[in-house]
């Protein structure tokens, strides 16, 4: 079989404009690493009408950081090698679908229901928008009166979870093609219950015990290959309680804790290895 050549193959790093504005340097670093390997890499902003879309024709590799998949069918990218695959994007960007997927595969997670104020009997609770991320649209509710203050127009777009005291400390495992790259621990700041780096949570590196790492890898194996993060709590029995899956996982906290880690280079190196396998499979008659 002929050697797979990467030179001049087209690649896209896809973002929505809001995430791109927060992660410009990281996005450009991914493109730079692609170009160093002789691919032709470009950034595509999905919701920017001024963006130049001339580079999307005949794209073979797509690193999707947009939290969306609708553009795939629109531009006929269905035969391209996609990071992350559609199933990961769908599960990660709808918190109720995250819950359903985890329950289906018998992984421990936080009880989750679609918002219905008539069924809420106990407090405190956490109410989140299904497509929220970064700690936005997440509310700690102490009583029924506080529910009335929430900006909820469509109840089906929101979920309800019990408030967990362990939730002020959350762990994030960065997954790269089935391997646990690094894990960080995030501790909520002061009276805030959200353990998000973007909400000023304290961050430190965390070394996983072997059995916790094994469980994380089991989840990743079921979910599929790509680059994403699994956010979880540890209960009093030191068991994983999965909270969320983040397919466009931010790298700022990890970069802060690991200044010598060239994350874009690591991601592209691993991605190109799997991209080559994809190309070889396409060559097999």
UniProtKB/Swiss-Prot annotation:
Gene3D superfamilies: ATP-grasp fold, A domain (3.30.1490.20), ATP-grasp fold, B domain (3.30.470.20). One of its GO terms (biological process) is SOS response. Residues 107-285 form the ATP-grasp domain. One of its GO terms (molecular function) is metal ion binding. One of its GO terms (cellular component) is cytoplasm. SUPFAM superfamilies: Glutathione synthetase ATP-binding domain-like. Disulfide bonds: none annotated. It comes from the Bacteria. This is Uncharacterized protein MG011 homolog. It comes from Mycoplasma pneumoniae (strain ATCC 29342 / M129 / Subtype 1).
């Amino acid at each position: 079989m002929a050697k797979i050549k990467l030179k001049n193959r087209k690649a896209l790093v896809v973002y929505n404009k809001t995430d791109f504005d927060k992660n410009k340097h990281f996005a450009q670093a991914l493109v730079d690493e692609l170009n160093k390997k002789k691919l032709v890499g470009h950034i595509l902003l999905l919701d920017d009408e001024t963006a130049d879309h001339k580079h999307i024709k005949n794209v073979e590799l797509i690193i999707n950081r947009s939290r969306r998949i609708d553009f795939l069918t629109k531009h006929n990218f269905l035969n391209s090698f996609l990071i992350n695959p559609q199933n990961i994007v769908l599960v990660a960007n709808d918190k109720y679908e995250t819950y359903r997927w985890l329950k289906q595969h018998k992984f421990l997670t936080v009880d989750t229901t679609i918002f219905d104020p008539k069924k809420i009997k106990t407090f405190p609770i956490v109410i989140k928008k299904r497509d929220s991320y970064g700690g936005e649209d997440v509310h700690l509710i102490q009583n029924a009166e506080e529910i009335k203050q929430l900006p909820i127009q469509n109840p089906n777009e929101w979920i309800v979870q019990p408030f967990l005291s362990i939730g002020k400390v959350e762990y994030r495992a960065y997954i790269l093609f089935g391997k646990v790259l690094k894990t960080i621990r995030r501790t909520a700041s002061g009276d805030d219950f959200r353990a998000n780096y973007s909400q000023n949570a304290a961050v430190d590196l965390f070394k996983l015990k072997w059995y916790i790492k094994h469980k994380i890898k089991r989840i990743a194996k079921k979910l599929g290959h790509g680059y994403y993060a699994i956010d979880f709590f540890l209960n009093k029995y030191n068991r994983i309680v999965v909270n969320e899956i983040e397919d466009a996982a931010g790298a700022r906290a990890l970069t802060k804790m690991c200044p010598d880690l060239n994350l874009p280079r690591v991601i592209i190196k691993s991605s190109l290895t799997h991209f080559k396998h994809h190309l070889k499979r396409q060559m097999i008659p």
